[in-house]
Amino acid sequence: MPVIKVRENEPFDVALRRFKRSCEKAGILSEVRSREFYEKPTTIRKRAKASAVKRHAKKLSRENARRIRLY
């Protein structure tokens, strides 16, 4: 859990912004969203595999685009 110390004479908005930023860096909101509903282990693995395939395809397309530009 991210903790921030409110500085002296610091506006509430600034402290809230710092807290939100620290929560985002810690990945708390995405973790809460992923744990909101139960997901079967097979579904988790399937989604992870699909994202890995998508990342790989994106990487290959970037490499191919770089090769095409060289000619």
From Swiss-Prot:
Highest taxon listed in the record's lineage: Bacteria
Family statement: Belongs to the bacterial ribosomal protein bS21 family.
Swiss-Prot/TrEMBL GO biological process terms: translation
Biased amino acid composition, Basic residues: 48-59
A Pfam family this chain is assigned to: Ribosomal_S21
HAMAP family recorded: Ribosomal_bS21
Biological source species: Aeromonas hydrophila subsp. hydrophila (strain ATCC 7966 / DSM 30187 / BCRC 13018 / CCUG 14551 / JCM 1027 / KCTC 2358 / NCIMB 9240 / NCTC 8049)
Spans annotated as Disordered: 48-71
Ribonucleoprotein in keyword set: yes
Keywords associated with the record: Ribonucleoprotein, Ribosomal protein
Gene Ontology molecular functions: structural constituent of ribosome
Gene3D superfamilies named among the record's database cross-references: Ribosomal protein S8
PROSITE patterns: RIBOSOMAL_S21
A cellular component annotation (GO) from this entry: ribosome
Name of the protein in its database record: Small ribosomal subunit protein bS21
Annotated Basic and acidic residues bias: 60-71
